[in-house]
Amino acid sequence: MNKKQKKVLIRIIAASVMMILFAFIPVEGWLEFVLFMIPYLIIGYDILLKAFKGIKNKQVFDENFLMAVATVGAIALGDYKEGVAVMLFYQIGELFQSYAVGRSRRNISELMDIRPDYANIERDGKLERVDPDEVVIGSVIVVQPGEKVPIDGVIIEGSTTLNTSALTGESMPREAKAGDDVISGCINMTGVLKIKTTKEFGESTVSKILDLVENSSSKKSRSENFISKFARYYTPAVCYGALALAILPPVVSMLLGFDARWGEWIYRALTFLVISCPCALVISIPLSFFAGIGGASNAGVLVKGSNYLETLSKTKYVVFDKTGTLTQGVFEVVGVHHSKLEEARILEYAALAESFSSHPISKSLQRAYGKEIDQSRVTDVKEISGEGVTAVVDGVSVAAGNTKLMKRLGIEYSDCHSVGTIVHMAVNGRYEGHILIADREKPNSKEAIAQLYRMGIKETVMLTGDTGKVADQVAGDLGISTVYSELLPGDKVAKVEELLSKKHSKEALAFVGDGINDAPVLSRADIGIAMGALGSDAAIEAADIVLMDDDPLKIAKAIKIAKKCLRIVYENIYFAIGVKIVCLILGALGIANMWVAIFADVGVMVIAVINAIRALFVKKL
């Protein structure tokens, strides 16, 4: 509890003790009024001040105004105990709500406790602690065992085990050695590391993640926007309704010659006011989303706003980019089928020609070549999107790519019956063979697809630039229902738009990619999910939801979290509105008294808040 909450608690205890004591003192009239005004002012002075300021600023209709009118009215009717009780229980509810929100915020802060407090820089043979913001790109920082890695960089000395659980939600540590990239927010567990920074702190992974989580509350869901608008019109409506309930029945009774019974009808109107307070909805709905986003963060699923959580819960179609999402994206050369030119020379030409590309296939060719790449040997490089590359290597014309490239160049090629990615090679316009490259499926991909179907996903779709043979085999192995192969990057956007046009307006389509070249498709889908986005700025920028590791099972987990959060939101909406409608009718009929009204207001709010906090707990999903 913070200092403000402790002060409110002391006031609640003091007012409660006084109220109980004064209830046993046999006094009446003005003395009873004076006695009960003491606990009333102790517990309610701030509510009265807020109500007065609201009236002064022409912002009349809020819960403070409702409570002030209801309690002052009850005291004016001589119902001192009820007046104090309404204010007392309202403050108890507010304290509970404040504590619950603070607790969920603390939980999220603890879960996302990845912001480093300092960075160690070596100066004159000594380690000096500096603010991470002061460290420039290219600086060498030292990270001791037990410390957080403060800034993204490359390990230049040392080896260790890194704990990435605060980022990924997974407890499995990761080995790291000299030459490996390392991201901020990880905890160094064993060895001393020297890291050369590659980013400023403000651009590092930890800063982007914290900024994403902190700003998530600004993007509100349709449910939250509905409740905000609802409260804006609902509160004035019930105030006028209560006024009508207090005035019209007595006036009609007088006109008909009956007893007006003003006191009874005013009491009913005050009860009506207390019951109608919209706190349960106004507080619990945003809290449900806030807790849901916090729970997702703990599981390594970063959600940029409650609107995305709401859309994700409606997902019925999941579209995957194959490479790096369902497969490991680690391509390996598994065979070289050559004619006259020897295998080593084909690999050399392919590796050099592809050396200017960042595509995983080019990386695999360079690994298979196994020697240092001298790019000065390569000239006139032309990369043709979705086909391959042409270049001049040591004065020799080289073409490396798929069948489309061979057809473009008018070169006759041989088909390969093995399943994998085929890189056809032509040297000086003559076909010299092909290189077979294979990607491995991720261990959990098949189970991830099965989980999606068990959750009610209607269709899974795989988009890939690979050949139909490779794509069909992967889709068949994993149980994917629809596959589109041999697509150019631009074709993927067109396919997603085609799928979007077929679905029902109340259903959502999610696209899952690894963030590499996927930004246009991530932006076009109803929900863009970037997988394994640790350290990927483009993915964090383009996606609506970021999975911090590359486990496909996290996709189903993210949808389960969204569904649980929305289920809690609707439970609170139906429960709060249902109880209030029943109690409002009973209050208007004179059946419900002020004590029932207290339950309908404070009791419902407390129950709704407790229910909302359940959204934090997602480990067993």
Predicted segment positions?
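P-type ATPase nucleotide-binding
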Residues: 333, 337-459, 468, 480-496
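Conserved ATP-binding TGD loop and adjacent catalytic N/P-domain core of P-type ATPases
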Residues: 395, 421, 427-571, 579
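Conserved catalytic phosphorylation-site environment of P-type ATPases
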Residues: 66-68, 167, 267, 277-353, ...
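Conserved cytosolic catalytic loops of P-type ATPases
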Residues: 110-203, 307-350, 392
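Transmembrane helix-loop-helix hairpins at the membrane interface
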Residues: 2-118, 220, 229, 236, ...
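Membrane-embedded transport module
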Residues: 241, 503-506, 543, 548-621
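Helix-interface capping motifs at the ends of transmembrane segments in multi-pass membrane proteins
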Residues: 17-34, 41, 53-62, 68-83, ...
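Juxtamembrane coupling segments of multi-pass membrane pumps/enzymes
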Residues: 87-145, 176, 303, 373-376, ...
